[in-house]
Amino acid sequence: MTTHELAFGFGYLGAALGVAMVVPQIVRIVRHPSLPGVSPISWALTVFGCLLWFTYGLRSGALPQLPGNLLLVCGAAAVVLLMKSPTSRARRAALLAIGGGLLAATAWMIPTEAVGYLAFAVGTVSTWPQLYDSVGNWRAHVNSGVSLSTWALRIASQVCWLAYALGTSDAPVAVGACVAGLTGVAMFALETAARAPAFGSARVVTETA
């Protein structure tokens, strides 16, 4: 097996983990819809970032980017629509459709490498609202609706994407994977610390997803 083939294997594994990470978050929202702390802005930006990575994969011939990001767009959109929010689901769906359409049109008008770096930029910014909310959860010791399993899978996915990027010399993916992985570690640590003092309490909703 060549280095290139091994790298593609890591890419497909990263894509599979990226798709799987959405499932625990959806399950947690459905089971505990009243829990706060999940950022709809973060998940909406995740939809846009994955749409850009999908377009980048189409234009660059990076096949591992295609199935995972397409499914992740659908999964992240489901999270946005399922979570409790003062904004109606119809309006959220319309905003996702308009934003996605504008980004997709832009992605086909700029150079391929620029699409990769735009996807990296959107992906990086997508974690900031959730990171901000999780800092608040940590300070208030809130057992939030954020799924720890989702962020653990996200970290594992980014490690695989980094291995893919190193094996294929794909700079945009390498930079994006490093930043997303480190942010994921910070998120996981904050949410774990926020829940630690509550262990043993009969009122705590434990991590079931």
Model-derived segments and their meaning:
Residues 1-209:
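Alpha-helical membrane-protein topology signature
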